[in-house]
Structure formats: C-alpha cells, structure tokens
Design a protein with these regions (language model features):
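ABC ATPase nucleotide-binding domains
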Residues: 106-263
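The feature captures the beta-strand-to-loop junction immediately N-terminal to the Walker
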Residues: 69-71
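Non-catalytic connector elements of ABC transporters
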Residues: 271-273, 280-394
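Helix-to-loop junction immediately C-terminal to a conserved catalytic motif
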Residues: 84
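Conserved coupling/switch loops of ABC nucleotide-binding domains, chiefly the family-specific signature
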Residues: 90-93, 143, 243, 381
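Conserved ABC transporter NBD signature motif
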Residues: 92-100
Length: 394
C-alpha cells in the first residue's frame, strides 16, 4: 500500500490536476518502460578504505517512483550519480532495463537529471532552455518547438515560454528544469534534492506536482532527498540508507509500521519514535517500571535479564490513571496544536533521564511539572535488540 499523494496534498494551483482533482490525460509522449537494477554496486573514493556505497542491491520496477533517503553522508546522492554515470562503480553493476550501463558514459544511458540547482541559462528564454538539449542533438526547430509546447502545456508553463529565468519564481524555474528533462523522453528520471532551494510552502506544492507528473507520465524515477516527509509522501517505495548501507526498502506505510531496525525507527516519522532502554523479565520488558508485553518466542530467544530497546510512536501513547500499568513521566512542556497536542516529558531519574514525546488530547492537557502515567497500545509497541538494533517483534 502506498500513501495517496495527490489526494492528500491537492492544491488549486496544481497545473497537473483537472477541476475534479483527477490527473489530466497525457498526449504526445512515448516514454520507454525501463527497470533499474543495482547489483551489489559499490563506490569507494580514492584515499578511503570505507565504501561510500557498499554492495547496494536494489530493484526498481517499470514506472516506479523510488526515493532514496537518509542523513548527510549516507550514500544516497552517490548512488544516484552511479546510476547517472557521474561516479565510477568499483564493484558490482548497474542496469537500465536489460542493458548493463556500468561502464557507459552518461550520454549513452538515456537518462535525464534534475538537480537542486536548476542550471538554467540566464540569457535564454524558457522555451530555449527547455529545447536546448534537443538542439544539441540536431533535432529540427519545428520538432523542438512542438515538444517544448507539449511539455509547457503539461507543466502549466505556456504563458512563460518567452520569459527569461530571472522573471520566474523558484517553483516555476524548477518546472522549467523538469520540462527540459521531459522533452528528451528518457527511460529514467533522476532527481537529486530538487526542492532544497524552495521555501517550505512552495516545497509542499511542488512535491505534489512532481509526484502527480510522474504518475501521469509513468516514467521510472529515482529521487534523492534527506527529508523523510518528502520521501513518505512521494515514493511508491522508499530506500533508507545509512553509512553507505541499505537499511530497508519498503512502502512508506511498512517503513512506518514495521521498521527493520532502530535507525529506521528513529529516522522515519515526525515526531520521531520514542526509543527506550528496557530489561527483559518474566512478564515482558521493564521500561522504568512500565512492563511492556513481549511475545514468548522473543522473550525465550533473548533470555532473562537481557537488554532490549522498546520503540513507541507518540500517537500510540495515552494518559492513564496512577493505578494502571504505565510509564511515569514528568511533564516538561505541552505544545498545543488545535485538535492535538504534544507532551514533552522526562522519564527516569538523575543522569539517566530521557525525553519522551506523546500525542495527547489538546482539550485536557496536563500542566507543566505535573507527573502523569503513559501507557501504549500493545499492538503498536516495537521491540529491538539492544546489541544489534534489529527488530524482534512481528
């Protein structure tokens, strides 16, 4: 299951949606279907012993929108550049469709890239920028103009074709950069943090337009971002990387509900999942006096008195009475956001205190400094190995 992008982030200004909110039909475009395969692909930079990308195995289906996400230095942009032919592959292979492109130059890979920097020629009009690559390929002026007009109509840029880039907004410039890629009719779109230069409001509307465009064209797309919200709202699947290693490749919903390890659990979700240290007992995992039920098979595998990490998302908590089984929390602050509120509190004592976040009913928030008990929905509690960080619960 993928998260509904266009339906949940629909904007009246989106030129890719009709008045009913459905995608407008695409005419005049003939994109070739293509899979993308990373086959144990590695990249080691000269002078470094540690791979920037370490044996990446990833299969991307025809027409799929795949997002690579992770913190700075995780290898996501390097992975994209390996596919583009801008980085050498030291081991393994990369294929587009059935063709091994590992050693092909970028111009022979039939891909188109959109960067964080739009790289538009300031002295050229929008139409000239969009058609420049076709001009370099020797495409006739008549054919170029036809493709440019079709792409401009697709992107809502028709009235801007005669303008220079300096007369456009950041979002419009980004659409021009996308139009320049579209007119080439490549097999694969590669996008490297294309929204990083936009303000917060424009990023939301532009990411909706990009996702809607990709679904209309049906072109295989690999998209890189450090923003997990972008990843979750745009991708059919999301590949999470850390230190050059693939941590999990799954649908946005599965990443959220069943993270493979502690890193994915803490990285995906806003606010982040609460990760608490616990100790295995006969009854479950004891977290500061709050006993979390544990599956018998998992408990026997860990053994009595073993350490474990318990993960609980903020929305899984509820405030309970002092007589119930719950986690004692001292309220530090409550952020009221209308229908919901977030409680930021402290658990533990002295130097071992840890911050915890819970989503609560905004109509009955506790006061700062109050002591409350929080309990979690047992079906939404995650348990991870304290030694490896791997997920233990189903």
């Amino acid at each position: 299951m993928t998260l509904p992008v266009a339906s949940c982030e629909r904007h009246a200004s989106n030129p890719l949606l009709g008045s009913s909110g459905t995608f407008l039909p695409v005419k005049g475009w003939s994109f070739f279907m293509a899979t993308v395969t990373y086959d144990s692909a590695s990249r080691i930079y000269p002078g470094s012993d540690k791979p920037a990308v370490d044996k990446l195995d990833l299969d991307i289906a025809d027409g799929e929108f795949m997002v690579l996400v992770g913190p700075s230095g995780c290898g996501k942009s390097t992975s994209l550049r390996m596919l583009a032919g801008l980085e050498e592959i030291n081991d393994g292979a990369v294929r587009i469709g059935d063709r091994d492109v590992t050693h092909l130059p970028p111009k022979d890979r039939d891909i188109a890239m959109v960067f964080q920097n739009y790289a538009l020629y300031p002295h050229m009009s929008v139409a000239e920028n969009m058609g420049f690559a076709l001009k370099m390929q020797g495409v006739s002026k008549e054919q170029r103009l036809q493709k440019v007009r079709e792409a401009a109509q697709l992107l809502g840029l028709e009235e801007f074709l005669d303008r220079k880039p300096k007369a456009l907004s950041g979002g419009q410039r980004q659409r021009v950069a996308m139009g320049r890629a579209i007119v080439r009719e490549p097999k694969v779109f590669l996008m490297d943090e294309p929204l990083s230069n936009l303000d917060a409001k424009l990023r939301v509307s532009t990411r909706t337009q990009i996702a809607a465009l990709q679904r209309r064209l049906g072109i295989t797309t690999v998209y890189v971002t450090h923003d997990q919200t972008e990843a979750m709202t745009m991708g059919d699947r999301v590949a999470v990387l850390k230190d050059g290693l693939l941590q999990q490749n799954d649908t946005p919903l599965n990443l959220y509900d069943k993270p493979n390890n502690v890193f994915v659990a803490g990285f995906i979700g806003s606010p982040a999942m609460n990760l608490l240290d616990g100790k295995v007992t006969e009854s479950g995992v004891d977290v500061g006096g709050y006993v979390v039920p544990l599956q018998p098979a998992v408990r026997s595998r860990l053994g009595q008195d073993a350490a474990a990490t318990v993960g609980i998302r903020p929305e899984a908590f509820r405030i309970v009475s002092n007589e119930e089984n719950g986690l004692p929390v001292e309220v530090a602050v409550v952020e009221e956001l209308g229908a919901d509120a977030y409680l930021y509190g402290l658990v533990g004592n002295g130097d071992e205190q840890k911050e915890i976040i819970a989503r609560i009913d905004a109509r009955r928030p506790p006061e700062k400094g109050a002591k409350v008990k929080l309990a979690a929905d047992t079906e939404r509690i995650h348990v991870f190995s304290a030694s490896t960080g791997d997920r233990l619960t189903d």
